[in-house]
Curated annotation (Swiss-Prot):
Component of the large ribosomal subunit. The ribosome is a large ribonucleoprotein complex responsible for the synthesis of proteins in the cell. It is found in: Cytoplasm. Belongs to the eukaryotic ribosomal protein eL28 family. It comes from the Eukaryota. Component of the large ribosomal subunit. It comes from Xenopus laevis. Keywords: Cytoplasm, Ribonucleoprotein, Ribosomal protein. This is Large ribosomal subunit protein eL28. GO terms for cellular component: cytoplasm; ribonucleoprotein complex; ribosome. The keyword Ribosomal protein applies.
């Protein structure tokens, strides 16, 4: 159960990081424009 939870947390953090990066990229794009 602990290992499964760890994997889920890793997946969640990974997706969150990518989504945050995407948002930051969009914001930077807007600032440049």
């Amino acid at each position: 159960a602990t290992s499964y939870e760890k994997i889920t947390i890793n997946k969640n953090s990974r997706s969150t990081l990518s989504s945050v990066r995407h948002i930051i990229r969009k914001n930077n794009y807007r600032k440049d424009l």
